[in-house]
């Protein structure tokens, strides 16, 4: 895997449109959205649960509801298929994303069971939309979730095939160690960037530089 380090802000074209997706709004997402708007760009936040303490911003798009999430969690716990349900919810979200036609889709977190990852990957690939996926060691898709029936080989094979075929995917890790762990879990073969979240202001500028470079 090639690790690319982005440490400066370039001159941006006016009018980037960025969709940020996560289970809930985070302070980092809020900071990115605020900075994008200061630069004359558009930020659309899509989450399952809306606002969280410290974010100071509500989601622009709501992803499913508590019943959808409960069903997803129950099915995933029974069959070790976290991130492989909520097809209807994911289709609804994708319809709205396609209508928005963003320059970049930023998946700020996929560790909670609220969307269908393989389905989302397939549609975004077909639409040829650049995607940035942020991961930490504890939020690598397909890892760290408990289930009644463990199906390690099936889960790993599904995630490897999903991410292996995902064209225009850019992986953003908070450390080189996380990048190495992600590669071990089948997320290798994509441009990989290291953006530490220790300094929020610096991370925001690096993310916006990344959007401009991959759009």
Whereabouts are the PLM-identified features?
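N-terminal subdomain of nucleotide-sugar transferases
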Residues: 4-59, 126-129, 166, 174, ...
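Active-site proximal beta-strand in glycosyltransferases
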Residues: 104-106, 121-144, 172
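A conserved catalytic-core segment of Leloir-type glycosyltransferases
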Residues: 38, 45-104
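Helix-loop-beta element that forms the nucleotide-linked donor phosphate-binding surface
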Residues: 179-197
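C-terminal alpha-helical cap of glycosyltransferases
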Residues: 199-215
